[in-house]
């Protein structure tokens, strides 16, 4: 008998069949407990902003410039310069961002971890990160991987003759994969069947040549895109494991017009308009090449599936030398310009100079080459100076020529290279900084001074702030105004709960609750909101007019203060005296500083804390609650105590009684938990969709309460019930109020990066 067969240990800790295997639809609370001190080796007292400010920024940039042209035998640089590879690394780090939920992006250095480190679209970026490890190692804690990846892309552009718009640091690393991001439901790499449902598959075109005259295509419906492809929200990539689109065309079908539709949708979901999209593609493809030297079956497993001896590398390549001229990355073998390590306008020049015909790369991927052998010898080889090539293009490149809107922009950039340079610089900065949040988080000497609308600008506070005496007087005015506790609390919640920890957007600062589009969202009950805001604005005007030293209170501060006053009054109604912490310093943005379309993405499709759902969704209401809680950076206990408190404060949209398990609304008691856990009642569904319920007295049959799925999950889900039992116990009232005030204050201050 072998030694192995005698061993009684078949599995290590954490192995075996999991709860998720048994109950795949079980509510996942693990996403509320990511990135704790238990996984962070830096320690709880680590201050990344302080460390970054002590960094010799120019020295880091010089070290990166040195890396650019110091080719390594283990991964030789194309054309003797790593710049294009590093641009791709930074682009793919930032390009996972999507507007729908603000998740993805470069802000946490997630490219180091699964699944991103093993996505098919990120082949060879394991090598890029390893090339800059000596720089990271040298500066250690003073610069995060997240910042270094983006900075390396910037330095790469500059080292190849491009003037960037700027760079800001301030992206602290995390130390584990983000489990909250929904990347899709497909179970195979490059699958797209789930995100597009059962929609019509793309059909191969009958002709693989595009002629030079764009008017022949301008009004032609793509033969490969009859019918709209509706991409699942909040996804912003067409296939599992891609950043944006399939460069060969939709589902690998080489149709540039159909490709343009995918490009417009995916780049749009990353907050890019048509001009920014063209600039990013034309600017990015001014550099470097793609890699498809041989058949894809030569490529080994991705990093997460590779052997220990690979030490984090993946995609080992057995074709030829497996590197240099034998590299296989995307399977496409395309070089766009004759100066792939120097900024130029040649990408657009070549795009419009030739008639293009379909061909295949050595790996068998669809790509395009000039007709009739045109352009032969124009393009240098990346590793062999004795070889020359014709220019080549991707299907997604030709989209810029044969989509009418993209073509118009591309031709303008072709005629005006300085416009492309400016547009690319701005779009690149937006791409790499979109998820950083407000300017208060931006660090470093290259932070641009220009105010950009997509940054959700907020004016600087230039006046004296209210003091404790003013705060007490203002709270008195608010409580005497005739507004109810529920109105005060719901208004403050409406303002603050737009915050997204993913891209640091939203929150109460800026006072945008009074502006379009937020003032008109159904979830904010516009008629009630207008009344509350009118009352608060009168209090604000009266206070500000009475000051002789320039002291002011903003409406943003007053909204939060009103909520605090409401919470304090509700606690007083329950017999407890509390003071809700309040820190003034918020400012009021203008409508001109507010991009209505951009802010529309912050409108909640569901807010379980207000028992609101905009429509019916495949995702359960309780899952949407957890999603909202995660964006608010709440833990499971914080989510639980917050919801239980808001229910008894009666802030449900439309004054719905679902979940208001108390006969003393606007009183901060633990009644929600006591009555939910009451065994004297029995719950039954009252709708065929199992989304509303009623509790009847077991003896009399009398209806005592009604509730939603969001309410009942706190008694149904074992972990949430355990937490609810803490707050539903006989001795829990004081602890409940204390914890509620703490998490309420946390939410009100989520966007106060100026306090850090």
Swiss-Prot record:
One GO MF term attached to the UniProt entry: metal ion binding
GO CC list: cytosol
GO annotation (BP), single: cellular response to hydrogen peroxide
Catalyses which reaction(s): H2O2 + AH2 = A + 2 H2O; 2 H2O2 = O2 + 2 H2O
Cofactor binding comment, as recorded: Binds 1 heme b (iron(II)-protoporphyrin IX) group per dimer.
Cross-link (Tryptophyl-tyrosyl-methioninium (Tyr-Met) (with W-91)), chain numbering: 244-270
Binding site for heme b: 285
Keyword Metal-binding set for record: yes
Cysteine-cysteine disulfides: none
Comp. bias regions, Basic and acidic residues: 214-223
Required cofactor names: heme b
Species per Swiss-Prot/TrEMBL record: Pseudomonas syringae pv. tomato (strain ATCC BAA-871 / DC3000)
Record's protein name: Catalase-peroxidase
Residues forming the catalytic site: 92 (proton acceptor)
């Amino acid at each position: 008998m072998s030694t192995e067969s005698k061993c009684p240990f078949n599995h290590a800790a954490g192995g075996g069949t999991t709860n998720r295997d048994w109950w795949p639809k079980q509510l996942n609370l693990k996403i509320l407990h990511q990135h704790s001190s238990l996984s962070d080796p830096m320690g709880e007292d680590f201050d990344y902003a302080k460390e970054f400010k002590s960094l010799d920024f120019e020295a880091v940039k010089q070290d990166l410039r040195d890396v650019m042209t110091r080719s390594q035998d283990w991964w030789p640089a194309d054309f003797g310069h790593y710049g294009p590879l590093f641009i791709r690394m930074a682009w793919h780090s930032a390009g996972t961002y999507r507007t729908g939920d603000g998740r993805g992006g470069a802000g946490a250095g997630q490219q180091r971890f699964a699944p991103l480190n093993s996505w098919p679209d990120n082949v060879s970026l394991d090598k890029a990160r390893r090339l800059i490890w000596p720089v990271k190692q040298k500066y250690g804690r003073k610069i995060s991987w997240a910042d270094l990846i983006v900075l390396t892309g910037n330095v790469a552009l500059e080292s190849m003759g491009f003037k960037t718009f700027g760079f800001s640091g301030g992206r602290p690393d995390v130390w584990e994969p983000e489990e909250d991001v929904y990347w899709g439901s497909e179970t195979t790499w490059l699958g797209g069947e789930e995100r597009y449902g059962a929609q019509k598959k793309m059909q191969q075109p009958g002709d693989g040549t595009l002629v030079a005259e764009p008017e022949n295509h301008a009004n032609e419906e793509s033969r490969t895109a009859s019918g709209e492809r509706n991409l699942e929200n909040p996804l912003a990539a067409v296939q599992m494991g891609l950043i944006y689109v399939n460069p060969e065309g939709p589902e690998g079908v080489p149709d540039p017009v159909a490709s343009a539709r995918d490009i417009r949708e995916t780049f749009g979901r990353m907050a890019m308009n048509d001009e920014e999209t063209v600039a990013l593609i034309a600017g990015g493809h001014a550099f470097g090449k793609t890699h498809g030297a041989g058949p894809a079956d030569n490529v080994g497993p991705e990093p997460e599936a590779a052997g220990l001896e690979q030490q984090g590398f993946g995609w080992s390549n057995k074709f030829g030398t497996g590197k240099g001229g034998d590299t296989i990355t995307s399977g496409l073998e395309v070089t766009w310009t004759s100066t792939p390590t120097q900024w130029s306008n040649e990408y657009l020049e070549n795009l419009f100079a030739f008639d293009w015909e379909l061909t295949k790369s050595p790996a068998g991927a669809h790509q395009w080459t000039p007709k009739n052998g045109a352009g032969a010898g124009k393009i240098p080889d990346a590793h062999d100076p004795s070889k020359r090539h014709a220019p080549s293009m991707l299907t997604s490149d030709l989209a810029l020529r044969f989509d009418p809107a993209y073509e118009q922009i591309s031709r303008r950039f072709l005629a005006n290279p300085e416009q492309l340079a400016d547009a690319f610089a701005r779009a690149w900065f937006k791409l790499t900084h979109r998820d950083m949040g407000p300017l208060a988080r931006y660090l470093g000497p290259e932070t641009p001074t220009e105010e950009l609308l997509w940054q959700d600008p907020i004016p600087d506070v230039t006046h004296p702030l209210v003091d404790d005496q003013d705060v007490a007087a203002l709270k008195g005015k608010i409580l005497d105004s005739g507004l109810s506790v529920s109105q005060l609390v719901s208004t403050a919640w409406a303002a603050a709960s737009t915050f997204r920890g993913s891209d640091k957007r939203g929150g109460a600062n800026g006072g945008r609750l009074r502006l379009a589009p937020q003032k008109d969202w159904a979830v904010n009950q516009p008629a009630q909101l207008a009344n509350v805001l009118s009352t608060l604005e009168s209090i604000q005007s009266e206070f500000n007019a009475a000051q002789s030293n320039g002291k002011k209170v903003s409406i943003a501060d007053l909204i939060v203060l009103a909520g605090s006053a409401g919470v304090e009054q509700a606690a007083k109604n329950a017999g407890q005296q509390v003071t809700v912490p309040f820190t003034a310093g918020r400012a009021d943005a203008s409508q001109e500083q507010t991009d209505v379309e951009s802010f529309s993405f912050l409108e909640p499709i569901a807010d379980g804390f207000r028992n609101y759902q905009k429509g019916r969704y495949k995702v359960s209401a309780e899952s949407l609650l957890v999603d909202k809680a995660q964006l608010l950076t709440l833990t499971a206990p914080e989510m639980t105590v917050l919801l239980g408190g808001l229910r008894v404060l009666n802030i449900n949209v439309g004054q719905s009684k679902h979940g208001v398990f108390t006969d003393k609304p606007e009183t901060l008691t633990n009644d929600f938990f006591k009555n939910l856990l009451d065994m004297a009642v029995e719950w039954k569904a009252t709708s065929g969709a199992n989304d509303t319920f009623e509790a009847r007295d077991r003896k009399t049959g009398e209806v005592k309460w009604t509730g939603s799925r969001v309410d009942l999950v706190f008694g149904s889900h074992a972990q949430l019930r355990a937490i609810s039992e803490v707050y539903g116990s006989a001795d829990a009232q004081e602890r409940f109020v204390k914890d509620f005030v703490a998490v309420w204050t946390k939410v009100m201050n989520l966007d106060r990066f100026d306090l850090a």
